[in-house]
Every structure is written in structure tokens, then in C-alpha cells.
Amino acid sequence: MENLSERFNVLQDQLMNIYETAAQTLEAQIEHWQILRREAVLLYFARQKGVTRLGYQPVPALMVSEAKAKEAIGMVLQLQSLQKSEFGKEPWSLVDTSTETYKSPPENHFKKGPMPIEVIYDKDADNANAYTMWRYIYYVDDDDKWHKSASGVNHTGIYFMHGSFRHYYVLFADDARRYSNTGHWEVKVNKDTVFTPVTSSTPPESPGGQADSNTSSKTPTTDTASRLSPTGSGERSQQTSTKGRRYERRPSSRTRRQQAQARQRRSRSKSRSRSRSQSRSRIRSRSRSRSRSESQSSKRRSRSRSRRKTSATRGRGPGSPTTTTSDRAARSPSTTSSATSQRSQRSRSRAGSSRGGRGRGGRRRHRLSESPTSKRSRRESGSVRLHGVSADAVGTSVHTVSSRHTGRLGRLLEEALDPPVILVRGDANTLRSFRNRAKHMYTGLFSSFSTAWSWVAGDGIERLGRSRMLISFISNSQRKHFDDAVRYPKGVDRSFGSFDSL
């Protein structure tokens, strides 16, 4: 207990020296985060041992200390990478390297030079919102090289240049839906109006366009349209952001797998509606046929009764006594009930025999119509892989090998058509870290990794969705072993595919 308290006090003294010195070097900032990491590890260990206080300092929960230690490790790795770049000699303060600055929009980027931006909605000075624009943004490209980019503001939002792409990390249209009634806003930089709202039919430029000289904060005042239409603003916001304001990307289009699933759902609903309509039509036809048969049987009964009456009158002759109503009532009820029961049994036996014949015949016809097709399909599917795969057919299949292939020859022939890959999607830094970790931990379970890349819109130059990375394999079995063994980072999803060649 005393040993832990002494070590904790030493770490506190080192932190106080750094705060008093306030050295603006990356070496001092890295040392600061190293001390914070050791402090979190010490508190974690103390909590594990049941210690709740170190002097006057209460010991937090294990999850809190673990999260702080991981945060410190991540900041140390980022600062060490920045130290190796050409920007390592620039002055860096504690504020510039704090987690609050690093996590603020644009998230997971180092930034310097905050500037206040005020946006007034509906020309009402009381209906205003404040934003922060950073003069310089530091980011890493796909080749792990650091770059320094200037930030700017226009009527659409606040952005920074990522190469030739304009990445918006604040969109005024998102807050205009909440704060504005007319869809108008004006942008002020240092209390000077930079963009005033005017009524115009020309829509504002879409995010992701090329940078021009009249949109940065250092340019003179210009007038431009910033009217928010109900449809256009929704489309612009959907095009520029997928995960809030984090990625400044357009959402990716639907994949072929999603489109195929949607088509399957439509076909299932159509087949269900058809089967329901067919069953209803069958029920109606059966009810109609029953009603017709009942009407015909009633007609036959009435005819037979009339014939019996006429034959009875003819047989009696003029001298025979007539039967009155009282005589009919005097007949025994047993004879009438037995006659009706015999009639009903005959009709049931006839209906059952006819129905049973139809059922047996229907089942027989169903088997006869079904068996040739199934046998033919089995013969065709079995005969496809009796031959080898031609050179032109290698790499042409886009489906994974199904489980119906039990032999090695069939599986090898199928895999020859399908050079497999895995496409992973997520944040660019997360994918790069995953690639570096997989190269050390899963050697031999893959062929190669690609760099992080993105799709670009066909109607613009903004990036679509999240970053992508491809992992290639020699065979499907190798891909399966890799997928079973690897643990994908949080927020990263995958999909399987193949190419003609790699």
C-alpha cells in the first residue's frame, strides 16, 4: 500500500513539472502521455488488489483505468509517428496534443489555430450557433505519410483539403433543419459577414468539389445563395456524410448482394401473392361446383318425386283410394329417416370415391411431372464437373464453392474458377492497424493485403462510404481458416468475393 502511494506521488510530481515547464515540443508531449499511461496502469493494479484510495486520490473502477491507459497508448503511437515526419519540429503545446482537441471535429486528427465561426439563421441575431474552424489540419495518407492542410469555410460548411478532395467536417445544413424555419443562414468570421443569404435558384455547390480561391476564410466577402430546400438539402447532406460528420463521404450505393436479396424478397412476395390468389380461386371454383352439384341433385330429387306421384296415380286408377295429408302424417317416421340416411350415405360414397380418385391421380401426375426435371437437373449438374477447367474459364465464377462437392477433384475444379478475396470496410486508420497486426499474428493464412482505398462518385469527386481494404488468398480453404482465426476490429465489417486475376 505504501509502496503504491509513493510511486503514485512520484508520477504526480513528474506531471506537475511538465505542466509548469509547458515545453512546446513533441518530446515533452510524448513524455506527458507516457506518464499518464503509467499512472493509469498503477491505478488499475491498485484496484485489482482491492485498494480504494492512494493518499487523497480515490482509485477509479477497472474499466475507467483501462480506458485511460488505452487512450494514452494510442496518443503515444500517434505522436511518435508525427515526430518522425517533417512536422515534428513544429511547436506543439499540451492543448494541441490533448484528447479533447484530437477528438473534436474533424475527429482523430491533430489540428492547430482555432477560429470562431458564427452562423445566424433566418436573419435573427438571437438564433445563432457557434462553430470552430481550425487553420491547419494534420492527417495521414494511405502510405502512412503525414500532410498539413489548410482549413476553410464557405456557405456549405467548414472543410479541409485532403489532397484534391474537399472534406467537410461541419455542415451548416444539418443544423439548419433544427434551428431555421426559412432555410436561410449567413456565415460570420471574426464578426465579419462572409456569406450572406440571398434568394437564388442556383443551388449551392455540392460538398466534395474542387477548392476555389473565394471560399477560404482569408478571401474578401462574397455573396452566394444558401437557401435550404427540403429535397436538395437532404440529398446534399446524404452525399457528404455517412456517419454523422465524421467521414465527410457520400454513402455507398447498394451492393450486388443487397440488390439480389431485394430481388429475392420481391419474387417471394409475388409468388406468395400468386399462390394465395390461386388457392382462393380453387376454393371459389370448388364452392361453385358444390353449389351446382347440390342444385342439380335437388332438381333430380324433385323430378323423381314428381315421377313417383304420377306413377302412383296411374297405378291406383279411378277406383283406388286417394292418400290424404293425415295418411302421410300417420306413416311411421322410421321409414322416412331410413330413406334419407340411405340417400346421404350413397351421395357421400360417390363423392368420396370421386375425390379419392382425383387425389390419387393428382399425386401421380405430380410425381410424373416432377421426376424427369429433377433427374435431368441432377444429370446436368453432375456432368458439368466431369471435365477439367479450360484456361479461358479460370477466374470467371463469382460464387463460392457450395457444400455439395464432397470430392477433392470437384472442389479443386470449382476453386480454380474463383480466386478468393475478403473486402473489409471501416475507418482508414483502423484498417491500417488491422493490416499491421494481421501481418505479425496471422502469417501464412493469407496471400497479400492492399492499401486502404475508397470508391469515388461517378457524378463528383467525393469519396463514397468508408475506406476499403482487400485481402487476397490462394484458395477458399485458406480464406476460411483466416476468417475463423482472425478477430476483426470494432466497426469493421467484411464481405467475400473473387477476381479474374490478382
From Swiss-Prot:
Biased composition (Low complexity): 312-344
Main location as per UniProt: host cell
One example GO MF annotation: nucleotide binding
HAMAP family, sorted: PPV_E2
Family: Belongs to the papillomaviridae E2 protein family.
Protein's name according to its UniProt entry: Regulatory protein E2
Stored InterPro entries: E2/EBNA1_C_sf, Nucleotide-bd_a/b_plait_sf, Papillomavirus_E2_C, PPV_E2_N, Reg_prot_E2, Regulatory_protein_E2_N, Regulatory_protein_E2_N_1, Regulatory_protein_E2_N_2
One Pfam family in the UniProt entry: PPV_E2_N
Bias kind Basic residues: ranges: 243-290, 298-311, 357-367
Assigned keywords, A-Z: Activator, DNA replication, DNA-binding, Early protein, Host nucleus, Phosphoprotein, Repressor, Transcription, Transcription regulation
Species in which this protein is naturally found: Human papillomavirus 25
Biased composition annotated in UniProt, kind: Polar residues: 211-242
The keyword Phosphoprotein is annotated on this UniProt entry: yes
Post-translational modification: Phosphorylated.
Any Gene Ontology CC annotation: host cell nucleus
UniProt-listed SUPFAM superfamilies: E2 regulatory, transactivation domain, Viral DNA-binding domain
Intracellular or extracellular location(s): Host nucleus
Region (Disordered) location: 195-388
Function of the molecule: Plays a role in the initiation of viral DNA replication. A dimer of E2 interacts with a dimer of E1 in order to improve specificity of E1 DNA binding activity. Once the complex recognizes and binds DNA at specific sites, the E2 dimer is removed from DNA. E2 also regulates viral transcription through binding to the E2RE response element (5'-ACCNNNNNNGGT-3') present in multiple copies in the regulatory regions of the viral genome. Activates or represses transcription depending on E2RE's position with regards to proximal promoter elements including the TATA-box.
Subunit and partners: Binds DNA as homodimer. Interacts with protein E1; this interaction greatly increases E1 DNA-binding activity. Interacts with protein L1; this interaction enhances E2-dependent replication and transcription activation. Interacts with protein L2; this interaction inhibits E2 transcriptional activity but not DNA replication function E2. Interacts with protein E7; this interaction inhibits E7 oncogenic activity. Interacts with host TAF1; this interaction modulates E2-dependent transcriptional regulation. Interacts with host BRD4; this interaction mediates E2 transcriptional activation function.
Example GO biological process: DNA replication
Region (Transactivation domain) residue spans: 1-201
Entry keyword annotation includes Cytoplasm: no
